[in-house]
Amino acid sequence: MDSRVHRDVGSNTHTGMKRLTVIAGPCVVENRDTTMRIADTLLLICDRLEINLLFKASYRKANRSRMDAFTGIGDMTALEILSEVHDRFAADVITDIHEAEEAARAAMFVQALQIPAFLCRQTDLLIAAAKTDLPINIKKGQFMSAAAMENAVGKIRSVTGRPVIITERGNSFGYNDVVVDMRNISLLSGICDGVLVDVTHTNGGAYRHSFALAAASIAAGADGIFLETHPDPGKALSDGKNMIPLYEVEGLLTQLKQIKEVVG
């Protein structure tokens, strides 16, 4: 096992989030080698910068627009790769689930679960995730107000006292566009244990916008960011246009840490 220090998920709750927190990784597990390369790079960066990292990758994409879109390499194969990331690097890993039946199985391989934005109101899914007793990240739906997310958090807290993070994912602004309302950061902070901002799915398919979104989010009081990254986004099998190239992540996180230190 890698000698890096394992950090317990949830030790960095909103009431004591002094370190920048990042959920980062590829959109989906494409293969073992790419996943390990991304995890190794991110962990080296975050250890060096003293940033809390949750490594994220979907083991299956269930919400693709096109029938011929890539959905995964097989559930068990992908979950075993995510488990290997944890074992090899002593890293906390998070993956998303789309149906209640997935929760217990996924929880055997990862240290936290994520609820997709489109499903953030699904009671059965939220309760199933809560019953695993793992920390949970809920991505706020593009159709949801910050205040409405209190109900989603309440469903989870009716079952478990484990940390609940909300990731701001923007709000619909006409057809095929979203905008991030920075007021939501302070509004959400009162109802959960930490607020992150998704800076890749809100960039309109132009990853350069992610840098300004990330800086503004931390300056506005977010505890951290959610981002997806890939060594070669042009060859990524899912969401390549939104992804930040892996070689640019360190510069971004260095800047965000500096902002975080100023705003506290």
Regions of interest found by a model, annotated:
Residues 74, 91-99, 111-124, 135-146, ...:
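Catalytic beta/alpha-barrel core
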Residues 51-58, 93-97, 197, 224-229:
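Short beta-strand segments at enzyme active-site cores
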Residues 18-20, 49-53, 89-93, 109-111, ...:
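Short, well-ordered coil/turn segments that N-cap beta-strands
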Residues 42, 70-93, 129, 133, ...:
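Alpha-helix-loop-beta-strand connector modules within alpha/beta enzyme cores
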Residues 67-76, 114-119, 176-182, 200-220, ...:
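Active-site-adjacent loop and "lid" segments of alpha/beta metabolic enzymes
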Residues 8-81:
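Conserved N-terminal beta1-alpha1 strand-loop-helix module at the mouth
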Residues 133, 137-231:
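Catalytic alpha/beta core domains of metabolic enzymes, predominantly
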